């Protein structure tokens, strides 16, 4: 159903495929003479399994040979390889060893940007160096962009913002000016009127009235501290 819905929109999807042939078609987008490839992998599917007689395809993080193949192929046809990975420990700000190990491997294989999902809470942003000296930007978890959950830390998410620069003289494409822009999911009593605020537009008054306070204490200062505890000042943009 999800593939049918998004298939009718002007949206690039990756991570779930109709069959093996569809999986092998790397999704690309070219803008301003820069070609991006988009790949998606997952540690698990939240207890759901693909039926044995289904042709649907998902690439799991345990299948490192397939991941390496896809990143390598994507590198050949694009300037920037963007990888989305569903991984990490749920509800934990701590980046686990498996995340770090796979991130470094994907960096070495040719990924340029790695964006993590799944933990529901934010995790750190850092830059890795590949064996050949290339740099790879990794945001281990952007947290929840929007949710109807009832834990304070799950109300805080982020957007990753950066510029892409192409040098015709050096024949290189790089990212620069990386920013982690925080967002806050806000709802009223009993999960009503859910909306999203950029942190720059959020206020102490809104935080004091957040419906999550019924289950989990929430405040403006809590948001700031959570962000500063997990996102390097090098990337954190609170303005």
How would you name each of these model-derived features?
Residues 1-239:
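Acidic, metal/ion-coordinating pockets
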């Amino acid at each position: 159903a999800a593939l049918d819905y998004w298939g009718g929109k002007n949206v690039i999807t990756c991570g779930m495929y109709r069959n093996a042939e569809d999986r092998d078609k790397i999704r690309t987008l070219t803008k301003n003479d820069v070609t991006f490839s988009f790949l998606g992998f997952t540690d698990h599917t939240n207890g759901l399994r693909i039926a044995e007689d289904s042709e649907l395809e998902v690439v799991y993080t345990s299948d490192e040979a397939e991941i390496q193949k896809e990143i390598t192929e994507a590198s050949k046809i694009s300037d920037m390889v963007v990888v989305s990975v569903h991984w990490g420990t749920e509800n934990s700000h701590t980046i686990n060893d498996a995340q770090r190990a796979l991130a470094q491997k994907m960096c070495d294989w040719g990924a340029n940007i790695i964006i993590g999902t799944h933990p529901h809470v934010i995790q750190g942003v850092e830059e890795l160096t590949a064996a050949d000296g290339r740099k790879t930007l990794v945001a281990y978890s952007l947290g929840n962009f929007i949710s109807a959950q009832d834990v304070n830390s799950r109300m805080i998410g982020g957007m990753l913002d950066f510029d892409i620069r192409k040098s015709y003289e050096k024949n290189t494409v790089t990212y620069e000016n990386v920013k982690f822009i925080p967002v806050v999911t806000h709802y009223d009593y009993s999960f009503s009127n859910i909306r999203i605020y950029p942190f720059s537009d959020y206020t102490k008054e809104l935080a004091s009235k957040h419906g999550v306070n019924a289950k989990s204490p929430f405040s403006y200062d809590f948001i700031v501290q959570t962000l500063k505890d997990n996102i390097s000042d090098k990337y954190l943009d609170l303005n």
